[in-house]
């Protein structure tokens, strides 16, 4: 039977009639039922380890040269928050590093905030910061 079909496909066979018996409706229905059950089982697979083991880290930096900005950016790419203290740098170099880090934070959809004189906090997108240092100082002054 199969050789006849193959021969007809390539135009070699002499007999153009089909020798197979047609399927009945009962045979066709029996074949379709097991396939539907298999598809339902595949949709029920769920991973349960997705949130296990996640830790957050904050890295402290006190850069002295512009090339230290690359290390800060690498930590942001690794989903670590970074606190940067520019107290030991001149203002021009510090401004260049802040510009570089701001670009990195923008590309990652993170945030950068000034938290003090020459101190900045840069966070990747999974971190959430609340409040401002200036607001906290004002509240403390009102309480005193």
From Swiss-Prot:
Q: Where is it localised?
A: Cytoplasm
- Return any one Pfam family short name: SepF
Specify where the region named Disordered lies, as residue ranges. 16-42
- Which keywords are on file for this protein? Cell cycle, Cell division, Cytoplasm, Septation
GO aspect biological process, one term:
division septum assembly
GO cellular component terms, semicolon-separated = cytoplasm
Q: Does the keyword Cell division apply?
A: yes
UniProt gene name: sepF
Lineage: superkingdom: Bacteria
Self-association or partners: how does it assemble? Homodimer. Interacts with FtsZ.
- Describe the family membership recorded for this protein in Swiss-Prot or TrEMBL: Belongs to the SepF family.
**Do you know which PANTHER family this protein is assigned to?**
CELL DIVISION PROTEIN SEPF (PTHR35798:SF1)
The stretch of residues making up the signal peptide is none
InterPro entries in the record = Cell_div_SepF, Cell_div_SepF/SepF-rel, SepF-like_sf
Q: What protein name is recorded for this chain?
A: Cell division protein SepF
Primary location recorded for the protein, binned into one broad class: cytoplasm
Q: What does this protein do?
A: Cell division protein that is part of the divisome complex and is recruited early to the Z-ring. Probably stimulates Z-ring formation, perhaps through the cross-linking of FtsZ protofilaments. Its function overlaps with FtsA.
